[in-house]
Amino acid sequence: MIPQLLQRSSRACPRYNPALYRLSTTSQQRPGLTQTFWTSAPRREQPRTPTDSKPTTTKPSAVFPANKKATKQNDPLVTVEKSAPEQRKADWAIMKEMTRYLWPKDDWGTKLRVSLAVSLLIGAKVLNVQVPFYFKSIVDSMNIDVAAVGGTATTVAGAMILAYGASRIGATVFQELRNAVFASVAQNAIRKVACNVFDHLLRLDLTFHLSKQTGGLTRALDRGTKGISFILSSMVFHVLPTALEISMVCGILTYNYGAKFAALTVLTMVSYTAFTIWTTAWRTKFRRQANAADNKASTVAVDSLINYEAVKYFNNEKFEVARYDKALGQYEKNSIKVATSLALLNSGQNIIFSSALTGMMYLAANGVAEGTLTVGDLVMVNQLVFQLSVPLNFLGSVYRELRQSLLDMETLFNLQKVNANIKEKAGAKPLVLSKGGEIKFENVNFAYHPNRPILRDLSLTIPAGKKVAVVGPSGCGKSTLLRLLFRSYDVQGGRVLIDDQDIRDVDLESLRRSIGVVPQDTPLFNDTVEHNIRYGSINATHEEVVAVAKRAHVHNTIQSFPDGYETKVGERGLMISGGEKQRLAVSRILLKDPPLLFFDEATSALDTHTEQALMMNINSILRERGRTSVFVAHRLRTIFDSDLIIVLKEGHVAEMGTHRELIDRDGVYAELWSAQETMFGEDGKEKSEEENDEQKKN
């Protein structure tokens, strides 16, 4: 009995032992609950096998799609084949959306620039059409024996030559001025659309971002923004002006040279346009497939580079290169189809135009032979037809590029159409902490997948201003509590309250501003140490940054860096250690200074000495400011002094109380504590099986 009391006393009054913080290598020998609990290594919640009791779930599909087909249909980055009417409807919707940026309601500066650009464009087209007339006059004027009449080129055709040159120069000047005037309109639209999409992406919930790969997303954004400028310029400078120029040329040919020229011109226009539209529509699927392959290749490359260390640790460079080569091979295959179909389109367009040009020249030459037309008329017809070739070829290429840009922008606008599962109620009021930050989970049910519930009718209360620990085996729902509290996900049954306010009824920004999180896997930006700390409060001064760094016991470490607080931490903070990253995360949260704090294995990467000093500082801050704090922990030594310890098991509360109460209860927590307490000897070495058996006998 006495040895048992001594052992019970030891569990209730823990002694500091550095060996207790080492990673256990014998955990696999421990059955049941203790098997998954003794490591402080990075963990993921694995949903447990469902039992007979199933919680009521309201919208499980909002968290995890029911099937792959639904996922593909709802993914804005996935290529979905459309019928011709559906594609036209989508294209017109994009064009309509772009008119908002081309002709904004209250932006008179943009309207003025667009109007001026259109005026310059019309002027350029009118001057272009004048050029063949002047050329005809020059040829007819020179089609005499100039020496016989005692004249010179200047006296015979000087005025026409000057007019010819002035028209060409004027058309070029007007066209370049038009480009300069319109540049600000296009760039402003690109900026607005890109910012709108980026803002929308940041507002989407965690479900969307966990299911998307960064490489494909950034590639789609890049292509879409590049297409904006072309679509805007096409709407203003290509489609309508080209149609205007074609109409003017056709009208001149008809008026000056009769019905035969008119009929041939109309036939050419109809054939050329129909062939271009049909062939381009047929080519669209190849371009869409090439875009999808491009997204995949970009995703593979970014994913491999982000996880560079994992690639090196497992010597999988060849495997990653093979993956990338496979993705590029698919892109190559689809790009060849695009290039081949483009060659077919260009060939067909040239055949149609060359046939029309041949017919026109025959009719004009026949008119000269009959004496009804002059040589100047022959030249003018040739010039007009060639002048017609420019807008025709341009219209063909514009249509091709327009289709490409519309496809790219379709993905961009599809991203804007993605609805967030987490929505703020209309008229939601800011969160008011009238009780100091009391948190309640009432009959909460939640599952990431409909068939794998995580929380089952969970009810618990976290008192205001207290330090509360949440412990339990991996997959029991500890980190899920934070995600629900932060509204990264919504509960599927029950409710979450903060000071008696349902978090679904309060303003999202005020809710998230009131919660501070120190995650186990600390997210850092590829920027300076100071920037990463200041991210907790963007307007903080350098002195405030240094102050919180000192409280987090990381100031001296930062001072030892090559550039101190200006040292770059690298991609995702990979240039500093895990412990340094966690202390920067603690500094960041101290700078934010929210009323509710959540620490998710926040010291798992620290050595015991630093961890102990840091926890003393954190505890003093919590007591001093009366903050409500929640600590998720596997190592019970770090949370035994909590005001309340909540033990989760299989999605519900197994027991709760103080450390001493739970030890006296001799339940799940006592089993966990005993396993960790007895795993190491006083010398810091793992106990042998004989030593453990001897202790059990006592």
From Swiss-Prot:
CDD domains: ABC_6TM_ATM1_ABCB7, ABCC_ATM1_transporter. It is found in: Mitochondrion inner membrane. Residues 32-63, 679-698 are annotated as: Disordered. One of its GO terms (molecular function) is ATP binding. Disulfide bonds: none annotated. Residues 114-404 form the ABC transmembrane type-1 domain. The keyword Mitochondrion applies. It comes from the Eukaryota. Keywords: ATP-binding, Membrane, Mitochondrion, Mitochondrion inner membrane, Nucleotide-binding, Transit peptide, Translocase, Transmembrane, Transmembrane helix, Transport. Glutathione binds at residues 283-287, 346-349, 396. GO terms for biological process: intracellular iron ion homeostasis. The keyword Transmembrane helix applies. It is a multi-pass membrane protein. SUPFAM superfamilies: ABC transporter transmembrane region, P-loop containing nucleoside triphosphate hydrolases. The chain crosses the membrane at residues 114-135, 159-182, 232-255, 257-277, 344-362, 378-399. GO terms for cellular component: mitochondrial inner membrane. Residues 439-675 form the ABC transporter domain. Residues 136-158, 256, 363-377 are mitochondrial intermembrane. Residues 682-698 have a biased composition (Basic and acidic residues). Performs an essential function in the generation of cytoplasmic iron-sulfur proteins by mediating the ATP-dependent export of Fe/S cluster precursors synthesized by NFS1 and other mitochondrial proteins. Hydrolyzes ATP. Binds glutathione and may function by transporting a glutathione-conjugated iron-sulfur compound. Belongs to the ABC transporter superfamily. ABCB family. Heavy Metal importer (TC 3.A.1.210) subfamily. PANTHER family: ATP-BINDING CASSETTE SUB-FAMILY B (PTHR24221), IRON-SULFUR CLUSTERS TRANSPORTER ABCB7, MITOCHONDRIAL (PTHR24221:SF402). This is Iron-sulfur clusters transporter ATM1, mitochondrial.
